[in-house]
Amino acid sequence: MAFKIASSPHLSRSFQTSSLMQRVILCALPGVAVQCFFFGWGTVIQALLAMSVALLSEAVVLKLRARNVTDTLRDNSALLTGLLIGIAIPPLAPWWVTVIGTLFAIVIVKQLYGGLGHNIFNPAMAAYVMLLISFPVQMTSWVAPSVIASQPVDFIHSLQMIFTGASSSEINAYKLGFDGISMATPLDTIKTDLAMGLTTTESLSKAIFSDGFGVGWFWVNLAYLAGGLVMLKLKVIRWHITAGILAALFICSGVGYLLNPDTFTGPLLHLFSGATMLAAFFIATDPVTAATSVRGRLVFGALIGILVYIIRTFGGYPDAFAFAILLANLCAPFIDHYMKPRAYGHRSAT
């Protein structure tokens, strides 16, 4: 038997930054495609706009900092940030919302701290939170899924509404579902209904939950789950953060549902609604802003899952991943300090 002889170091080859970012973008495309199918061409338009602004703004800042523009842009990190912002923003949000959010992510959150590898917050999530607080109306105006919408939005109308604006009556016309009720995301609907005194069973009887999870959102999450599993297979990301998020969210929601099913929604709805799979696989796993050790990544992920459940259930924002990830980013150095692996021959890591 012939053995292959190689010199040290005997380590598996890791991806270059540009290759890693490229793989993340490619694995996210199935989710983007399904999101576009259910919510219209606005998803693609917003993503392309955000990616273009991200590249342009990063190039300008790098030029001002006297850095190599071409080599830095080739790492594809700006493209990924733009993509995440574009798919997180409502499809028919005005163009200036996307531009402001992308500029904030690249210029303030990323480059102001020194560029890739130095930022302490996830740029896309920081931009999303800034936009949500600053422009709550524009950031919560989701259209009805195309399969139940009274007027599905085509490509031309999406362009017109994003770049030239539309009247309130026109927007409402596109937001109306077949039952004549202005549509919101499934999590928004449940949150509003519970505040009005309805039970979860009564809320889940609405048209938006005709498939049991929220029309469109189940398939969107399933597509991002498939892309995330491919990333795990390719070793683009590690499983610890994702597992921590999903396990903590499942356990917390399961306990709540067992205690009071009329007030708390079940685990499956939490896992397959909103941005759960997108955040668990594509956002929270950002190696720059997450914890680094194995135990630290598990704790980091579990913290996000717990925070998401708390904010979704008791807070004012139905989908809480952006807030949860930013809070976990703040805790990452603390987690790393106390979760350092034990050095061989020593009693503890500290």
Curated annotation (Swiss-Prot):
One GO BP: electron transport chain
Top enzyme class: translocase
Major site of localization recorded for this protein: membrane
Pfam families (alphabetical): NQR2_RnfD_RnfE (PF03116)
Ranges that cross the membrane: 25-45, 89-109, 129-149, 212-232, 239-259, 264-284, 298-318, 319-339
Required cofactor(s): FMN
Record key words, sorted: Cell inner membrane, Cell membrane, Electron transport, Flavoprotein, FMN, Membrane, Phosphoprotein, Translocase, Transmembrane, Transmembrane helix, Transport
Residues found modified as FMN phosphoryl threonine: T185
Top-level taxon of the source organism: Bacteria
Entry EC no(s): 7.-.-.-
Locations listed in the record: Cell inner membrane
GO cellular component: plasma membrane
Membrane topology recorded in Swiss-Prot or TrEMBL: Multi-pass membrane protein
Family: Belongs to the NqrB/RnfD family.
Family annotation (PANTHER family): ELECTRON TRANSPORT COMPLEX PROTEIN RNFD, ION-TRANSLOCATING OXIDOREDUCTASE COMPLEX SUBUNIT D
Subunit field text: The complex is composed of six subunits: RnfA, RnfB, RnfC, RnfD, RnfE and RnfG.
Function: Part of a membrane-bound complex that couples electron transfer with translocation of ions across the membrane.
Protein name: Ion-translocating oxidoreductase complex subunit D
Gene: rnfD
